[in-house]
Amino acid sequence: MENLVKSCAGIEKKRSNLTPSMEDILTESKERSSTSGASYESSSTTTVASSSPPPPPSQILGWPIRKASFRKNSKESVNFDHKKLTLHDDSGFKAKEMNSADVEMMKERFAKLLLGEDMSGSGKGVCTALAISNAITNLCATIFGQLWRLEPLSSEKKEMWRREMEWILSVSDHIVELTPSTQTYPDGNKFEVMTCRPRFDLFINLPALRKLDNMLLDILASFKKTEFWYVDQGIVASENDGSASFRRKIQRQEEKWWLPVPRLAPNGLTEEARTELNHKRECATQILKAAMAINSLALTEMDVPKSYLETLPKNGRSCLGDVIYRYVTSDKFSAESLLDCLDLSSEHIALDIANRVEASIYVWRRRVQTKLGVNNNTSSTTPKLTWEMVKELMAAGDKRGLLVERSETLLRCLKQRFPSLTQTSLDISKIQWNKDIGKSILESYSRALESLASNIIARIDDLLYVDDLTKQSDDNNLLSSPAVSSIIAHKKVVPLPYLISASGTPYRTSFSTTPGFSPSMISPKKGERRTPYSSKDTNKIIEKGLPSRGYGVRRVLNNYLGMESKLKICVNPSDNADTAVINQISKDVEEEKKRNSTSVHQKGPPKYTVS
Protein backbone atom coordinates (compact mmCIF):
# COMPACT_ATOMS: atom_id res chain seq x y z
CA MET A 1 0.00 0.00 0.00
CA GLU A 2 2.84 2.36 0.85
CA ASN A 3 4.51 1.64 -2.48
CA LEU A 4 1.27 2.44 -4.26
CA VAL A 5 1.01 5.77 -2.45
CA LYS A 6 4.58 6.64 -3.39
CA SER A 7 3.98 5.80 -7.04
CA CYS A 8 0.86 7.93 -7.11
CA ALA A 9 2.77 10.82 -5.61
CA GLY A 10 5.41 10.46 -8.29
CA ILE A 11 2.79 10.48 -11.04
CA GLU A 12 1.28 13.64 -9.63
CA LYS A 13 4.67 15.32 -9.59
CA LYS A 14 5.26 14.41 -13.21
CA ARG A 15 1.89 15.77 -14.19
CA SER A 16 2.55 19.06 -12.45
CA ASN A 17 5.95 19.29 -14.28
CA LEU A 18 7.86 19.49 -11.01
CA THR A 19 11.43 18.26 -10.81
CA PRO A 20 12.67 16.55 -7.65
CA SER A 21 14.62 18.76 -5.29
CA MET A 22 18.24 18.27 -4.30
CA GLU A 23 17.26 17.11 -0.81
CA ASP A 24 15.12 14.28 -2.20
CA ILE A 25 18.01 13.11 -4.37
CA LEU A 26 20.41 13.12 -1.43
CA THR A 27 17.96 11.24 0.85
CA GLU A 28 17.35 8.59 -1.80
CA SER A 29 21.08 8.14 -2.38
CA LYS A 30 21.64 7.82 1.39
CA GLU A 31 18.95 5.16 1.65
CA ARG A 32 20.45 3.20 -1.23
CA SER A 33 23.95 3.42 0.21
CA SER A 34 22.72 2.31 3.64
CA THR A 35 20.89 -0.69 2.21
CA SER A 36 23.88 -1.66 0.06
CA GLY A 37 26.23 -1.21 3.01
CA ALA A 38 24.05 -3.40 5.22
CA SER A 39 23.92 -6.14 2.61
CA TYR A 40 27.72 -5.92 2.14
CA GLU A 41 28.28 -6.16 5.91
CA SER A 42 26.06 -9.21 6.19
CA SER A 43 27.87 -10.93 3.34
CA SER A 44 31.30 -10.04 4.75
CA THR A 45 30.43 -11.38 8.20
CA THR A 46 29.43 -14.71 6.72
CA THR A 47 32.71 -14.97 4.81
CA VAL A 48 34.75 -14.08 7.88
CA ALA A 49 33.01 -16.76 9.88
CA SER A 50 33.70 -19.38 7.24
CA SER A 51 37.48 -18.72 6.68
CA SER A 52 40.32 -16.32 7.57
CA PRO A 53 40.30 -13.19 5.38
CA PRO A 54 43.11 -12.80 2.81
CA PRO A 55 44.95 -9.48 2.59
CA PRO A 56 43.39 -6.80 0.40
CA PRO A 57 44.21 -7.03 -3.31
CA SER A 58 46.03 -3.70 -3.25
CA GLN A 59 48.45 -5.08 -0.66
CA ILE A 60 49.12 -8.22 -2.72
CA LEU A 61 49.42 -6.62 -6.13
CA GLY A 62 51.52 -3.73 -4.93
CA TRP A 63 52.03 -0.07 -5.77
CA PRO A 64 50.20 0.57 -9.08
CA ILE A 65 46.88 -0.97 -8.03
CA ARG A 66 46.92 1.01 -4.80
CA LYS A 67 47.67 4.22 -6.67
CA ALA A 68 45.04 3.49 -9.29
CA SER A 69 42.38 2.85 -6.64
CA PHE A 70 43.29 6.14 -4.97
CA ARG A 71 42.98 7.95 -8.28
CA LYS A 72 39.63 6.32 -8.95
CA ASN A 73 38.20 7.37 -5.60
CA SER A 74 39.54 10.89 -5.99
CA LYS A 75 38.07 11.17 -9.49
CA GLU A 76 34.69 9.93 -8.29
CA SER A 77 34.63 12.52 -5.50
CA VAL A 78 35.64 15.27 -7.90
CA ASN A 79 32.98 14.24 -10.39
CA PHE A 80 30.33 14.16 -7.66
CA ASP A 81 31.26 17.66 -6.49
CA HIS A 82 31.29 18.80 -10.09
CA LYS A 83 27.79 17.47 -10.63
CA LYS A 84 26.63 19.28 -7.52
CA LEU A 85 28.03 22.52 -8.90
CA THR A 86 26.33 22.04 -12.23
CA LEU A 87 22.97 21.58 -10.52
CA HIS A 88 23.29 24.75 -8.46
CA ASP A 89 24.30 27.48 -10.91
CA ASP A 90 24.77 28.16 -14.59
CA SER A 91 28.55 28.59 -14.33
CA GLY A 92 28.83 24.85 -13.84
CA PHE A 93 27.68 24.25 -17.41
CA LYS A 94 30.69 26.19 -18.72
CA ALA A 95 32.99 24.16 -16.52
CA LYS A 96 31.35 21.00 -17.79
CA GLU A 97 31.93 22.09 -21.37
CA MET A 98 35.62 22.84 -20.63
CA ASN A 99 35.97 19.48 -18.98
CA SER A 100 34.55 17.73 -22.01
CA ALA A 101 36.93 19.67 -24.27
CA ASP A 102 39.86 18.53 -22.14
CA VAL A 103 38.65 14.96 -22.37
CA GLU A 104 38.43 15.18 -26.15
CA MET A 105 41.93 16.64 -26.32
CA MET A 106 43.25 13.87 -24.10
CA LYS A 107 41.61 11.28 -26.34
CA GLU A 108 43.29 12.84 -29.37
CA ARG A 109 46.72 12.87 -27.72
CA PHE A 110 46.54 9.25 -26.61
CA ALA A 111 45.16 8.18 -29.99
CA LYS A 112 48.25 9.65 -31.67
CA LEU A 113 50.47 7.84 -29.19
CA LEU A 114 48.73 4.52 -29.76
CA LEU A 115 48.75 4.89 -33.54
CA GLY A 116 52.42 5.89 -33.55
CA GLU A 117 51.64 9.20 -35.32
CA ASP A 118 50.21 7.22 -38.26
CA MET A 119 46.65 8.43 -38.71
CA SER A 120 45.96 5.87 -41.44
CA GLY A 121 46.12 3.06 -38.91
CA SER A 122 48.06 0.80 -41.26
CA GLY A 123 50.77 0.05 -38.70
CA LYS A 124 53.47 2.14 -40.37
CA GLY A 125 53.88 4.49 -37.43
CA VAL A 126 56.82 4.89 -35.10
CA CYS A 127 57.25 2.96 -31.88
CA THR A 128 55.62 4.12 -28.66
CA ALA A 129 58.87 5.39 -27.13
CA LEU A 130 59.61 7.64 -30.10
CA ALA A 131 55.98 8.83 -30.21
CA ILE A 132 56.16 9.92 -26.56
CA SER A 133 59.53 11.61 -27.16
CA ASN A 134 58.12 13.52 -30.14
CA ALA A 135 55.03 14.50 -28.14
CA ILE A 136 57.13 16.05 -25.35
CA THR A 137 59.41 17.77 -27.87
CA ASN A 138 56.49 19.24 -29.83
CA LEU A 139 54.76 20.41 -26.66
CA CYS A 140 57.95 22.15 -25.51
CA ALA A 141 58.29 23.85 -28.90
CA THR A 142 54.66 24.99 -28.74
CA ILE A 143 54.90 26.49 -25.25
CA PHE A 144 58.50 27.72 -25.06
CA GLY A 145 59.45 28.01 -28.72
CA GLN A 146 58.91 31.78 -28.73
CA LEU A 147 60.52 32.59 -25.39
CA TRP A 148 62.02 35.85 -26.61
CA ARG A 149 61.42 37.99 -23.53
CA LEU A 150 62.02 37.69 -19.81
CA GLU A 151 58.41 37.78 -18.70
CA PRO A 152 55.97 35.42 -16.96
CA LEU A 153 54.21 32.80 -19.02
CA SER A 154 50.56 33.36 -19.71
CA SER A 155 48.14 31.38 -17.58
CA GLU A 156 46.85 29.51 -20.64
CA LYS A 157 50.31 28.33 -21.68
CA LYS A 158 51.29 27.36 -18.14
CA GLU A 159 48.06 25.41 -17.65
CA MET A 160 48.45 23.71 -21.03
CA TRP A 161 52.06 22.71 -20.25
CA ARG A 162 51.24 21.22 -16.87
CA ARG A 163 48.06 19.50 -18.00
CA GLU A 164 49.47 17.82 -21.09
CA MET A 165 52.74 16.90 -19.38
CA GLU A 166 50.70 15.23 -16.65
CA TRP A 167 48.85 13.25 -19.32
CA ILE A 168 52.06 12.12 -20.99
CA LEU A 169 53.88 11.34 -17.75
CA SER A 170 50.93 9.32 -16.45
CA VAL A 171 52.33 6.44 -18.53
CA SER A 172 55.30 6.27 -16.15
CA ASP A 173 52.98 5.49 -13.21
CA HIS A 174 52.46 2.01 -14.64
CA ILE A 175 56.11 1.28 -15.51
CA VAL A 176 57.05 -1.00 -12.62
CA GLU A 177 59.49 -3.72 -11.72
CA LEU A 178 58.68 -6.92 -9.81
CA THR A 179 60.61 -7.68 -6.64
CA PRO A 180 60.26 -10.74 -4.38
CA SER A 181 58.82 -10.15 -0.92
CA THR A 182 56.99 -12.05 1.80
CA GLN A 183 53.37 -11.49 2.76
CA THR A 184 52.11 -12.48 6.21
CA TYR A 185 48.44 -13.49 6.49
CA PRO A 186 46.40 -12.92 9.65
CA ASP A 187 46.58 -16.60 10.53
CA GLY A 188 50.39 -16.39 10.65
CA ASN A 189 51.17 -18.06 7.34
CA LYS A 190 53.92 -16.46 5.22
CA PHE A 191 54.02 -16.60 1.45
CA GLU A 192 56.64 -15.32 -0.97
CA VAL A 193 55.04 -13.18 -3.65
CA MET A 194 56.21 -10.72 -6.32
CA THR A 195 55.30 -7.13 -5.51
CA CYS A 196 55.34 -4.16 -7.85
CA ARG A 197 57.28 -0.99 -7.29
CA PRO A 198 58.18 1.89 -9.61
CA ARG A 199 61.27 1.43 -11.72
CA PHE A 200 64.36 2.74 -10.00
CA ASP A 201 65.53 5.24 -12.65
CA LEU A 202 62.05 6.75 -12.96
CA PHE A 203 61.59 6.80 -9.20
CA ILE A 204 64.81 8.82 -8.79
CA ASN A 205 64.94 11.10 -11.84
CA LEU A 206 61.33 11.90 -12.66
CA PRO A 207 60.54 13.77 -9.40
CA ALA A 208 63.82 15.65 -9.82
CA LEU A 209 62.82 16.75 -13.33
CA ARG A 210 59.42 17.90 -12.07
CA LYS A 211 61.15 19.95 -9.38
CA LEU A 212 63.46 21.54 -11.96
CA ASP A 213 60.44 22.28 -14.15
CA ASN A 214 58.69 24.15 -11.34
CA MET A 215 61.86 26.08 -10.53
CA LEU A 216 62.21 27.30 -14.13
CA LEU A 217 58.58 28.40 -14.22
CA ASP A 218 59.12 30.25 -10.93
CA ILE A 219 62.12 32.07 -12.43
CA LEU A 220 59.99 33.22 -15.35
CA ALA A 221 57.16 34.22 -13.02
CA SER A 222 59.54 36.46 -11.03
CA PHE A 223 59.97 38.87 -13.98
CA LYS A 224 56.83 40.88 -13.22
CA LYS A 225 58.05 44.29 -12.12
CA THR A 226 61.27 44.91 -14.00
CA GLU A 227 63.50 47.85 -14.88
CA PHE A 228 63.72 46.88 -18.55
CA TRP A 229 61.44 46.49 -21.50
CA TYR A 230 61.67 45.18 -25.05
CA VAL A 231 61.41 46.80 -28.46
CA ASP A 232 61.22 44.96 -31.77
CA GLN A 233 64.20 45.45 -34.04
CA GLY A 234 62.05 46.74 -36.88
CA ILE A 235 60.83 49.71 -34.82
CA VAL A 236 63.00 52.84 -35.00
CA ALA A 237 63.82 54.25 -31.59
CA SER A 238 63.05 57.87 -30.83
CA GLU A 239 65.83 60.38 -30.30
CA ASN A 240 64.51 61.29 -26.86
CA ASP A 241 65.01 57.74 -25.65
CA GLY A 242 68.10 57.50 -23.49
CA SER A 243 69.00 54.05 -24.77
CA ALA A 244 68.59 54.85 -28.46
CA SER A 245 72.19 56.00 -28.82
CA PHE A 246 73.70 52.56 -28.25
CA ARG A 247 71.03 50.66 -30.13
CA ARG A 248 73.12 50.23 -33.26
CA LYS A 249 76.09 48.97 -31.22
CA ILE A 250 74.37 45.71 -30.25
CA GLN A 251 76.03 43.19 -32.52
CA ARG A 252 75.14 40.29 -30.23
CA GLN A 253 71.77 39.73 -31.89
CA GLU A 254 72.60 40.41 -35.52
CA GLU A 255 72.44 36.72 -36.35
CA LYS A 256 69.08 36.33 -34.57
CA TRP A 257 67.33 39.31 -36.09
CA TRP A 258 63.88 38.21 -34.94
CA LEU A 259 64.66 38.65 -31.25
CA PRO A 260 63.47 41.89 -29.62
CA VAL A 261 66.07 44.23 -28.19
CA PRO A 262 66.06 44.84 -24.41
CA ARG A 263 65.94 48.51 -23.45
CA LEU A 264 66.95 50.18 -20.21
CA ALA A 265 66.84 53.54 -18.54
CA PRO A 266 69.70 55.96 -19.36
CA ASN A 267 71.48 55.03 -16.12
CA GLY A 268 71.12 51.29 -16.70
CA LEU A 269 70.13 48.74 -14.10
CA THR A 270 70.42 49.39 -10.40
CA GLU A 271 72.80 47.34 -8.30
CA GLU A 272 69.95 45.43 -6.66
CA ALA A 273 68.39 44.50 -10.01
CA ARG A 274 71.74 43.43 -11.44
CA THR A 275 72.50 41.30 -8.37
CA GLU A 276 69.10 39.66 -8.63
CA LEU A 277 69.64 38.96 -12.33
CA ASN A 278 73.00 37.34 -11.61
CA HIS A 279 71.40 35.20 -8.91
CA LYS A 280 68.67 34.03 -11.29
CA ARG A 281 71.25 33.29 -13.95
CA GLU A 282 73.23 31.18 -11.49
CA CYS A 283 70.08 29.25 -10.53
CA ALA A 284 69.25 28.63 -14.19
CA THR A 285 72.82 27.47 -14.79
CA GLN A 286 72.60 24.92 -11.98
CA ILE A 287 69.25 23.69 -13.34
CA LEU A 288 70.82 23.35 -16.78
CA LYS A 289 73.68 21.27 -15.38
CA ALA A 290 71.29 18.95 -13.55
CA ALA A 291 69.11 18.47 -16.65
CA MET A 292 72.19 17.78 -18.79
CA ALA A 293 73.41 15.18 -16.30
CA ILE A 294 70.07 13.33 -16.39
CA ASN A 295 69.98 13.55 -20.18
CA SER A 296 73.49 12.19 -20.63
CA LEU A 297 72.75 9.36 -18.19
CA ALA A 298 69.61 8.38 -20.09
CA LEU A 299 71.47 8.46 -23.42
CA THR A 300 74.34 6.40 -22.03
CA GLU A 301 71.97 3.67 -20.84
CA MET A 302 70.32 3.38 -24.26
CA ASP A 303 71.51 0.60 -26.54
CA VAL A 304 73.58 1.43 -29.61
CA PRO A 305 71.39 0.66 -32.64
CA LYS A 306 72.59 -1.77 -35.26
CA SER A 307 71.88 0.71 -38.04
CA TYR A 308 74.55 3.03 -36.59
CA LEU A 309 77.13 0.25 -36.32
CA GLU A 310 76.49 -0.84 -39.90
CA THR A 311 77.28 2.61 -41.27
CA LEU A 312 80.68 2.84 -39.55
CA PRO A 313 83.85 2.51 -41.66
CA LYS A 314 86.23 -0.39 -41.25
CA ASN A 315 89.15 1.33 -39.52
CA GLY A 316 89.72 4.27 -37.21
CA ARG A 317 91.97 6.22 -39.57
CA SER A 318 89.13 6.84 -42.02
CA CYS A 319 86.96 8.05 -39.11
CA LEU A 320 89.42 10.48 -37.57
CA GLY A 321 91.45 11.58 -40.56
CA ASP A 322 95.22 11.55 -40.90
CA VAL A 323 95.97 14.48 -38.59
CA ILE A 324 93.91 13.42 -35.57
CA TYR A 325 94.83 9.76 -36.06
CA ARG A 326 98.55 10.63 -36.01
CA TYR A 327 98.13 12.53 -32.74
CA VAL A 328 96.01 9.82 -31.09
CA THR A 329 98.39 7.00 -32.01
CA SER A 330 101.56 8.86 -31.02
CA ASP A 331 103.62 7.89 -27.99
CA LYS A 332 103.00 11.15 -26.14
CA PHE A 333 99.30 12.00 -26.23
CA SER A 334 97.59 15.00 -24.65
CA ALA A 335 93.94 15.72 -25.38
CA GLU A 336 94.22 19.40 -24.45
CA SER A 337 97.24 19.91 -26.69
CA LEU A 338 95.46 18.22 -29.58
CA LEU A 339 92.40 20.43 -29.15
CA ASP A 340 94.65 23.49 -29.08
CA CYS A 341 96.11 22.49 -32.44
CA LEU A 342 92.72 21.86 -34.08
CA ASP A 343 90.51 24.47 -35.67
CA LEU A 344 87.55 24.85 -33.29
CA SER A 345 86.33 28.22 -34.49
CA SER A 346 82.66 27.18 -34.59
CA GLU A 347 80.39 24.61 -32.99
CA HIS A 348 79.75 22.97 -36.36
CA ILE A 349 83.42 22.03 -36.63
CA ALA A 350 83.44 20.83 -33.02
CA LEU A 351 80.34 18.71 -33.65
CA ASP A 352 81.95 17.15 -36.74
CA ILE A 353 85.07 16.25 -34.73
CA ALA A 354 82.89 14.80 -31.95
CA ASN A 355 81.07 12.61 -34.47
CA ARG A 356 84.37 11.35 -35.87
CA VAL A 357 85.87 10.59 -32.47
CA GLU A 358 82.71 8.81 -31.32
CA ALA A 359 82.64 6.71 -34.48
CA SER A 360 86.30 5.71 -34.01
CA ILE A 361 85.54 4.55 -30.45
CA TYR A 362 82.94 2.06 -31.63
CA VAL A 363 85.08 0.97 -34.59
CA TRP A 364 87.95 0.02 -32.29
CA ARG A 365 85.61 -1.59 -29.78
CA ARG A 366 84.10 -3.73 -32.51
CA ARG A 367 87.56 -4.81 -33.68
CA VAL A 368 88.51 -5.81 -30.14
CA GLN A 369 85.30 -7.80 -29.70
CA THR A 370 85.73 -9.61 -33.01
CA LYS A 371 89.32 -10.56 -32.15
CA LEU A 372 88.27 -11.87 -28.76
CA GLY A 373 85.45 -13.79 -30.41
CA VAL A 374 87.96 -15.53 -32.69
CA ASN A 375 90.08 -16.51 -29.69
CA ASN A 376 87.15 -17.82 -27.69
CA ASN A 377 85.73 -19.86 -30.56
CA THR A 378 86.72 -23.53 -29.98
CA SER A 379 84.82 -25.21 -32.79
CA SER A 380 86.54 -27.98 -34.76
CA THR A 381 86.15 -26.18 -38.11
CA THR A 382 88.37 -23.21 -37.16
CA PRO A 383 92.15 -23.76 -37.36
CA LYS A 384 94.14 -23.81 -34.14
CA LEU A 385 96.07 -20.67 -33.36
CA THR A 386 99.74 -20.77 -32.48
CA TRP A 387 101.19 -19.01 -29.46
CA GLU A 388 102.72 -16.29 -31.64
CA MET A 389 99.37 -15.53 -33.25
CA VAL A 390 97.69 -15.36 -29.85
CA LYS A 391 100.33 -12.91 -28.60
CA GLU A 392 99.88 -10.73 -31.68
CA LEU A 393 96.13 -10.70 -31.22
CA MET A 394 96.43 -9.79 -27.55
CA ALA A 395 98.91 -7.01 -28.33
CA ALA A 396 96.61 -5.64 -31.02
CA GLY A 397 93.71 -5.77 -28.58
CA ASP A 398 95.68 -3.89 -25.94
CA LYS A 399 96.67 -1.25 -28.49
CA ARG A 400 93.08 -0.74 -29.62
CA GLY A 401 91.96 -0.58 -26.00
CA LEU A 402 94.49 2.20 -25.43
CA LEU A 403 93.19 4.03 -28.51
CA VAL A 404 89.62 3.70 -27.21
CA GLU A 405 90.65 5.27 -23.89
CA ARG A 406 92.42 8.13 -25.66
CA SER A 407 89.45 8.79 -27.91
CA GLU A 408 87.10 8.81 -24.93
CA THR A 409 89.38 11.29 -23.17
CA LEU A 410 89.46 13.49 -26.27
CA LEU A 411 85.67 13.40 -26.57
CA ARG A 412 85.25 14.27 -22.90
CA CYS A 413 87.59 17.26 -23.17
CA LEU A 414 85.82 18.44 -26.30
CA LYS A 415 82.44 18.36 -24.56
CA GLN A 416 83.91 20.26 -21.63
CA ARG A 417 85.07 23.01 -23.96
CA PHE A 418 81.68 23.13 -25.67
CA PRO A 419 79.11 22.39 -22.94
CA SER A 420 76.21 23.49 -25.15
CA LEU A 421 77.20 21.18 -28.00
CA THR A 422 74.24 19.73 -29.85
CA GLN A 423 73.49 16.04 -30.01
CA THR A 424 75.85 13.86 -31.99
CA SER A 425 74.77 11.45 -34.70
CA LEU A 426 75.01 8.56 -32.22
CA ASP A 427 72.64 10.32 -29.79
CA ILE A 428 70.16 11.01 -32.57
CA SER A 429 70.19 7.39 -33.71
CA LYS A 430 69.75 6.22 -30.12
CA ILE A 431 66.67 8.39 -29.68
CA GLN A 432 65.27 7.25 -33.02
CA TRP A 433 65.67 3.51 -32.44
CA ASN A 434 65.09 3.38 -28.68
CA LYS A 435 62.38 0.97 -27.48
CA ASP A 436 62.46 1.72 -23.74
CA ILE A 437 59.58 4.06 -22.89
CA GLY A 438 60.94 5.05 -19.47
CA LYS A 439 64.31 6.13 -20.86
CA SER A 440 62.57 7.96 -23.67
CA ILE A 441 60.50 9.95 -21.14
CA LEU A 442 63.58 10.88 -19.10
CA GLU A 443 65.61 11.87 -22.16
CA SER A 444 62.94 14.01 -23.83
CA TYR A 445 61.81 15.69 -20.59
CA SER A 446 65.37 16.57 -19.58
CA ARG A 447 66.10 17.83 -23.11
CA ALA A 448 63.06 20.11 -22.96
CA LEU A 449 64.22 21.54 -19.63
CA GLU A 450 67.71 22.00 -21.08
CA SER A 451 66.28 24.11 -23.87
CA LEU A 452 64.19 26.22 -21.50
CA ALA A 453 67.08 26.83 -19.09
CA SER A 454 69.51 27.74 -21.87
CA ASN A 455 66.98 30.21 -23.33
CA ILE A 456 66.56 31.91 -19.96
CA ILE A 457 70.34 32.17 -19.54
CA ALA A 458 70.71 33.63 -23.04
CA ARG A 459 68.03 36.27 -22.41
CA ILE A 460 69.66 37.25 -19.11
CA ASP A 461 73.07 37.49 -20.82
CA ASP A 462 71.61 39.78 -23.49
CA LEU A 463 70.13 42.00 -20.80
CA LEU A 464 73.41 42.23 -18.88
CA TYR A 465 75.24 42.96 -22.13
CA VAL A 466 72.90 45.85 -22.89
CA ASP A 467 73.36 47.14 -19.34
CA ASP A 468 77.14 47.19 -19.84
CA LEU A 469 76.72 49.02 -23.13
CA THR A 470 74.45 51.57 -21.47
CA LYS A 471 76.98 52.40 -18.78
CA GLN A 472 79.86 52.49 -21.27
CA SER A 473 77.89 54.77 -23.58
CA ASP A 474 77.42 57.25 -20.74
CA ASP A 475 81.19 57.41 -20.22
CA ASN A 476 81.84 57.74 -23.95
CA ASN A 477 79.26 60.49 -24.28
CA LEU A 478 80.97 62.34 -21.45
CA LEU A 479 84.38 62.10 -23.13
CA SER A 480 83.08 62.91 -26.62
CA SER A 481 81.16 66.03 -25.61
CA PRO A 482 82.41 69.35 -27.16
CA ALA A 483 83.35 70.86 -23.81
CA VAL A 484 85.50 67.90 -22.79
CA SER A 485 87.15 67.68 -26.21
CA SER A 486 88.07 71.38 -26.08
CA ILE A 487 89.61 70.86 -22.66
CA ILE A 488 91.63 67.90 -23.92
CA ALA A 489 92.87 69.88 -26.93
CA HIS A 490 94.08 72.76 -24.78
CA LYS A 491 97.87 72.67 -24.58
CA LYS A 492 98.18 73.78 -20.95
CA VAL A 493 95.88 71.14 -19.52
CA VAL A 494 97.44 67.88 -20.70
CA PRO A 495 101.23 67.68 -21.14
CA LEU A 496 102.58 65.99 -24.24
CA PRO A 497 104.43 63.02 -22.66
CA TYR A 498 101.27 61.70 -20.98
CA LEU A 499 98.83 62.07 -23.87
CA ILE A 500 97.26 58.85 -25.21
CA SER A 501 96.50 58.53 -28.90
CA ALA A 502 92.92 57.86 -29.93
CA SER A 503 94.05 55.42 -32.60
CA GLY A 504 94.92 52.67 -30.15
CA THR A 505 98.70 53.20 -29.83
CA PRO A 506 100.11 51.28 -26.85
CA TYR A 507 100.21 53.30 -23.66
CA ARG A 508 103.53 54.68 -22.42
CA THR A 509 104.22 56.74 -19.34
CA SER A 510 106.95 58.98 -20.80
CA PHE A 511 109.21 59.19 -23.83
CA SER A 512 112.31 58.34 -21.82
CA THR A 513 111.13 54.80 -21.06
CA THR A 514 111.27 51.60 -23.06
CA PRO A 515 108.42 51.19 -25.59
CA GLY A 516 105.44 49.08 -24.63
CA PHE A 517 105.97 46.79 -27.61
CA SER A 518 109.11 45.32 -29.17
CA PRO A 519 110.62 47.27 -32.10
CA SER A 520 111.46 44.00 -33.83
CA MET A 521 107.77 43.44 -34.45
CA ILE A 522 107.68 46.44 -36.80
CA SER A 523 109.26 46.10 -40.24
CA PRO A 524 109.00 49.33 -42.25
CA LYS A 525 110.22 49.40 -45.83
CA LYS A 526 113.82 50.32 -46.49
CA GLY A 527 114.52 53.85 -47.57
CA GLU A 528 111.21 55.11 -46.25
CA ARG A 529 111.31 58.61 -44.87
CA ARG A 530 108.62 59.86 -42.54
CA THR A 531 108.21 63.58 -41.87
CA PRO A 532 105.56 63.73 -39.21
CA TYR A 533 106.18 67.36 -38.24
CA SER A 534 105.65 70.37 -40.45
CA SER A 535 108.08 72.69 -38.67
CA LYS A 536 111.42 73.56 -40.24
CA ASP A 537 113.49 72.53 -37.20
CA THR A 538 112.11 69.04 -37.26
CA ASN A 539 112.74 68.64 -41.00
CA LYS A 540 116.35 69.70 -40.58
CA ILE A 541 116.94 67.18 -37.81
CA ILE A 542 115.42 64.36 -39.82
CA GLU A 543 117.27 65.24 -43.04
CA LYS A 544 120.60 65.28 -41.23
CA GLY A 545 120.09 62.14 -39.24
CA LEU A 546 118.21 59.65 -41.39
CA PRO A 547 120.64 58.99 -44.32
CA SER A 548 123.53 58.02 -42.06
CA ARG A 549 121.65 55.79 -39.61
CA GLY A 550 121.29 52.04 -39.62
CA TYR A 551 118.24 49.85 -39.78
CA GLY A 552 117.72 49.49 -36.03
CA VAL A 553 117.86 53.23 -35.40
CA ARG A 554 115.27 53.83 -38.10
CA ARG A 555 112.92 51.40 -36.36
CA VAL A 556 113.31 53.16 -33.03
CA LEU A 557 112.64 56.55 -34.58
CA ASN A 558 109.71 55.27 -36.57
CA ASN A 559 108.35 53.90 -33.35
CA TYR A 560 108.54 57.27 -31.60
CA LEU A 561 107.91 59.61 -34.48
CA GLY A 562 105.01 57.48 -35.69
CA MET A 563 103.22 58.07 -32.45
CA GLU A 564 104.08 61.75 -32.49
CA SER A 565 102.52 62.11 -35.95
CA LYS A 566 99.30 60.72 -34.57
CA LEU A 567 99.43 63.13 -31.63
CA LYS A 568 100.11 66.28 -33.62
CA ILE A 569 96.39 66.91 -34.12
CA CYS A 570 96.00 67.46 -30.37
CA VAL A 571 99.02 69.66 -29.49
CA ASN A 572 100.71 72.56 -31.23
CA PRO A 573 104.32 71.51 -32.14
CA SER A 574 105.62 75.06 -31.95
CA ASP A 575 105.28 75.08 -28.18
CA ASN A 576 108.19 74.85 -25.76
CA ALA A 577 107.23 71.30 -24.85
CA ASP A 578 107.64 70.32 -28.52
CA THR A 579 111.07 71.83 -28.78
CA ALA A 580 112.13 69.99 -25.64
CA VAL A 581 110.96 66.71 -27.12
CA ILE A 582 112.75 67.39 -30.42
CA ASN A 583 115.95 68.16 -28.58
CA GLN A 584 115.62 64.92 -26.66
CA ILE A 585 115.14 63.02 -29.93
CA SER A 586 118.24 64.63 -31.44
CA LYS A 587 120.26 63.55 -28.41
CA ASP A 588 118.97 60.01 -28.80
CA VAL A 589 119.96 60.07 -32.47
CA GLU A 590 123.51 61.07 -31.65
CA GLU A 591 123.82 58.32 -29.06
CA GLU A 592 122.51 55.76 -31.54
CA LYS A 593 125.05 56.90 -34.15
CA LYS A 594 127.87 56.36 -31.67
CA ARG A 595 126.60 52.92 -30.73
CA ASN A 596 126.12 52.01 -34.37
CA SER A 597 129.72 52.90 -35.13
CA THR A 598 130.96 50.67 -32.29
CA SER A 599 128.80 47.68 -33.31
CA VAL A 600 129.46 47.53 -37.05
CA HIS A 601 130.69 43.93 -36.98
CA GLN A 602 127.56 42.50 -35.35
CA LYS A 603 125.49 40.00 -37.31
CA GLY A 604 121.93 41.02 -38.02
CA PRO A 605 120.22 44.22 -36.91
CA PRO A 606 121.42 45.34 -33.47
CA LYS A 607 119.03 45.68 -30.55
CA TYR A 608 118.64 49.10 -28.99
CA THR A 609 117.17 50.37 -25.77
CA VAL A 610 116.28 53.99 -25.24
CA SER A 611 117.48 55.64 -22.04
From Swiss-Prot:
- Respond yes or no to whether keyword Ribonucleoprotein is given for this record: no
Domain of life of the organism in this record?
Eukaryota
Write out the biased-composition intervals (Low complexity): 34-51
Residue numbers spanned by region Disordered: 1-62, 513-541, 588-611
Please give the coiled-coil regions recorded for this protein: none
Q: Report the residue ranges that make up the PRONE domain in this protein.
A: 93-477
Supply the name of the protein: Rop guanine nucleotide exchange factor 5
The top of its lineage is: Eukaryota, Viridiplantae, Streptophyta, Embryophyta, Tracheophyta
Which gene specifies this protein's sequence? ROPGEF5
